[in-house]
Amino acid sequence: MGPIGTEADENQTVEEIKVEPYGPGHTTPRGELAPDPEPELIDSTKLTEVRVVLILAYCSIILLGVVGNSLVIHVVIKFKSMRTVTNFFIANLAVADLLVNTLCLPFTLTYTLMGEWKMGPVLCHLVPYAQGLAVQVSTVTLTVIALDRHRCIVYHLDSKISKQNSFLIIGLAWGISALLASPLAIFREYSLIEIIPDFEIVACTEKWPGEEKSIYGTVYSLSSLLILYVLPLGIISVSYVRIWSKLKNHVSPGAANDHYHQRRQKTTKMLVFVVVVFAVSWLPLHAFQLAVDIDSQVLDLKEYKLIFTVFHIIAMCSTFANPLLYGWMNSNYRKAFLSAFRCQQRLDAIQSEVCVTGKAKTNVEVEKNHGAADSAEATNV
């Protein structure tokens, strides 16, 4: 996650000078920032064809992410029947991804292509903080969704999280994430680095207290990896394994209740896919960052910058994948998306699939009578 900040020493050669990435969220690579003065030092990211591919990749992610996540937020706000607790959490994921798409990725692409920080000191502190914040909010929200569904389905609890409490949980998620990401904004340095005599570049690097290779950066990096990736995914995995086992072994007493049970399975399956996409897309970048934290010689790889950029692009794909999953795997979102594009408020078509009708309430009562109760809003989106 967040690596140790470094500064260029006057005795270092061009080949030795490295600049650290942003930290949790990794909006920029640690590769050389300066245009290399000698041809043999040019890395692949400076090749025209590679730059074209990077521009197309980042622009596609930004476009798909902005459109898809904006659409998710729009339908949850517009259609009353979509305003369930689970959908509020899903909309919160969309807000976090939208933050990355609009505030982080454009500057990341610019930084990668230009080789130095041209966006000023304010954004030097703000951009890495924003992406670290967004990633942490996403992780916390996915964990909350998993625990809520586990509570309702595995333990047969009737009481659900109220809409008011869901907003409180969302606020706490942002507040806690803001505190955890704050070192990314505080321990940041906007400075000039002399590459060779009479040649300087503007760098935006981590600057931790103490010596040049401070232990604080490594501690923060590994702690963030454990607390904000490994531990949450462990909790989420256990929760969904238990949920899936419960649903698989449950015997429905009637046709109506069987339909309700099937909808629970479909919703759970969709949310599991969301978690898998998030975990898999971020895994290469986290693994690569862990390798750097363990052995700083990884920074000396000629294609370090290209490897980092490829892994970063893979991680950023998670910011537009969720809306595609919703449209593909959930009929409510699919109908809501189509209605939004047609500028029609077809609440009747959407409501027929949401457990807010008398039929759904009847299904809930049947579930209660057979010891398998679940929140209507917690099991349907």
UniProtKB/Swiss-Prot annotation:
A GO term, aspect molecular function: neuropeptide Y receptor activity
Disulphide bonds in the chain: C124-C204
Region annotation (Disordered) ranges: 1-37
Extracellular side: 1-52, 109-125, 188-217, 291-305
Membrane protein topology class: Multi-pass membrane protein
Covalently lipidated residues, kind S-palmitoyl cysteine: C343
Membrane-crossing residue ranges in chain numbering: 53-73, 88-108, 126-146, 167-187, 218-238, 270-290, 306-326
Coiled-coil region(s): none
GO cellular component: plasma membrane
Domain of life: Eukaryota
Protein localization: Cell membrane
UniProt keyword terms in alphabetical order: Cell membrane, Disulfide bond, G-protein coupled receptor, Glycoprotein, Lipoprotein, Membrane, Palmitate, Receptor, Transducer, Transmembrane, Transmembrane helix
Positions bearing carbohydrate: N11
Cytoplasmic side: 74-87, 147-166, 239-269, 327-381
Function as written in the Swiss-Prot or TrEMBL entry: Receptor for neuropeptide Y and peptide YY.
Family membership: Belongs to the G-protein coupled receptor 1 family.
Full protein name: Neuropeptide Y receptor type 2
Gene: NPY2R
